[in-house]
Amino acid sequence: MMRREDEEEEGTMMKAKGDLEMKEEEEISETGELVGPFVSAMPTPMPHNKGTRFSEAWEYFHLAPARAGHHPNQYATCRLCGRQVSRGPGVNVGTTALWKHLKSMHREELEKSGHGQAGQRQDPRPHGPQLPTGIEGNWGRLLEQVGTMALWASQREKEVLRRERAVEWRERAVEKRERALEEVERAILEMKWKVRAEKEACQREKELPAAVHPFHFV
């Protein structure tokens, strides 16, 4: 008899405790503020890496009650509109989704508080190696210079080839002139030889009758 009364009393206490928790959860979803025992669940802004500053997004959010089948830190409640925003599955989740919600729904509030550009410097988790600032411009200028040098080299090579061909043409022209001069000189020598031969023949013809008839004119 006493045991049954104890069990009934314990069941009544458990039911009252459950009703109290449900009431507190309803107050959370309606006002967006934590009350009762959930105040201790107020999230302390967690840095993503040691030595980094706390995210300013937590000025506008607090962790929502855990949902069945989800990580306790997955959902956060917006203090401005009371909506619950998913931060993504897993443990090491950032505040990117929170900043997106603030920028899309409460941009004016962010600008008033001076946090309009704050989301851009949060969650510095690069997916790959960061290139130095301006590296693309430097590469562009370098490629442009290389292209200019290649074009200049190509034009220079064409100019050299053109000059070489011009020199070859001039050399062939000089050779032709030299051969023509040699032919002219040879022709002149032949003419001289012919003229000399003719003179000698004439001279012999003149001397021949005088030798045959020495007293012909006496």
From Swiss-Prot:
Induction: Induced by TGF-beta. Residues 105-114 have a biased composition (Basic and acidic residues). Pfam families: zf-BED (PF02892). Residues 1-24, 104-137 are annotated as: Disordered. Disulfide bonds: none annotated. Keywords: DNA-binding, Metal-binding, Nucleus, Repressor, Transcription, Transcription regulation, Zinc, Zinc-finger. PROSITE patterns: ZF_BED. This is Zinc finger BED domain-containing protein 2. It comes from Homo sapiens (Human). One of its GO terms (molecular function) is RNA polymerase II transcription regulatory region sequence-specific DNA binding. Expressed in keratinocytes. It is found in: Nucleus. Zn(2+) binds at residues 78, 81, 101, 106. GO terms for cellular component: chromatin; nucleus. GO terms for biological process: negative regulation of transcription by RNA polymerase II; positive regulation of keratinocyte differentiation. Its main location: nucleus. Residues 1-11 have a biased composition (Acidic residues). Transcriptional regulator which has intrinsic repressor activity and which competes with the transcriptional activator IRF1 for binding to the 5'-[CA]GAA[AC]C[CT]-3' consensus sequence in gene promoters. May thereby play a role in keratinocyte differentiation. A zinc finger (BED-type) spans 52-113. SUPFAM superfamilies: beta-beta-alpha zinc fingers.
